[in-house]
Amino acid sequence: MTCTIDKILQDAKTLLERLKDHDNAAESLIDQSSALHKRVEAMKEVGTAMPEKYQEELADIKDASKLKPHVLLCQENTQIRDLQQENKELWVSLEEHQYALELIMSKYRKQMLQLVANKKPAPTEPVLEAHKTFSSDLECQIDRICVMGDIMRDAIQLDEDKAYNIQEKLAQLELENKELREILSTSKESLHSSKRESEWNFSEKTQ
């Protein structure tokens, strides 16, 4: 039982480390979104007079806003589902250990009651010493399970919070992606219009 409890405690700690990695990935995603937002603002300031040299950058921004955030968020959502499933499995294992301890304590109490009821004149010190040792071991096991339960509750709460935050960030990125596409469309139309106007003016002059 001790080895199994140690393994569950280690799994819980590993889960917390994974959630921290998940948080770091989300922060990286926010940084990417901020960079895209700054570039959007820069394009708004330039307006319809955007030089030709920015066309390649616009294409890169479009590809990044269209693919990269979506792929990363899909990966994050998959990790969230995996962590939620792992949380459920660890929680079930914890409940099984608690139930096993309750059964052990129940049988132990029955044996002690039978021993007291059927006791004969005999030295009581060995029985008391055994009772003390067994009780101490059980208390240690119960304390460790309580600690593990607290870790699991914190991990589950953290996992739920991260899932909610990822959904918010997904909505924000989708909105920014929509704005980027609108700006790209407007910029292209403006450039085409300017080009047509220049060609028309040139043809007028030549005539």
Curated annotation (Swiss-Prot):
Coiled coil: 4-32, 154-193
GO cellular component terms, semicolon-separated: FAR/SIN/STRIPAK complex
A Pfam family of this chain: SIKE
UniProt entry keywords in alphabetical sequence: Coiled coil
One GO BP: negative regulation of hippo signaling
One Gene Ontology molecular-function label: protein-macromolecule adaptor activity
Region annotated Disordered, chain positions: 186-207
Phosphoprotein found in the keyword field: no
Stored PANTHER family: SIKE FAMILY MEMBER, SUPPRESSOR OF IKBKE 1
Protein role: Suppressor of IKK-epsilon. Associates with the striatin-interacting phosphatase and kinase (STRIPAK) core complex, forming the extended (SIKE1:SLMAP)STRIPAK complex. The (SIKE1:SLMAP)STRIPAK complex dephosphorylates STK3 leading to the inhibition of Hippo signaling and the control of cell growth.
Subunit structure: Interacts with IKBKE and TBK1 via its coiled coil region. Interaction with TBK1 is disrupted upon viral infection or TLR3 stimulation. Interacts with CDC42BPB. Associates with the STRIPAK core complex composed of PP2A catalytic and scaffolding subunits, the striatins (PP2A regulatory subunits), the striatin-associated proteins MOB4, STRIP1 and STRIP2, PDCD10 and members of the STE20 kinases, such as STK24 and STK26.
Name the UniProt record assigns to this protein: Suppressor of IKBKE 1
Organism the protein comes from: Xenopus tropicalis (Western clawed frog)
Gene name per UniProt: sike1
